């Protein structure tokens, strides 16, 4: 099975974590117009769909989610995702959300309300093709763990992190491990 169309699916108060795990050979997946607003745990939903190159989840209502950990982890062939309209205001766990998405080239998450975010460890780890990442609107006042968040992001140009409030963050270890860009991120407003 290489292509699957599941548009219009209604998931009511369910856990769809790891839902597609047995279908690792999928290259195309239509999950448009899903109703998942009552699903708190979306962790690992698309992991590890390493052959998947096409995915449209832009219309998802994730306002009821508290965990997006590993959601797209290991989707190594996906080059772009439009998640700009997502309401992630209740999400605490973003760990490894895009980890290992080696072909992902750009991502605009600037409109995300990150006030509830606690764990962002390895969120973009291994996104080696990621050049453009807009996180400019983020305020991370409750974030506790950002370890290895940008680890092995070899192509990333200077992300705008100037608005981040990291005074409550207890783990910043290896935040930029493997970061080789010529420009330095702006930490001028950070209070640690």
Walk through the language-model features, giving the residues of each.
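Negatively charged
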Residues: 1-192
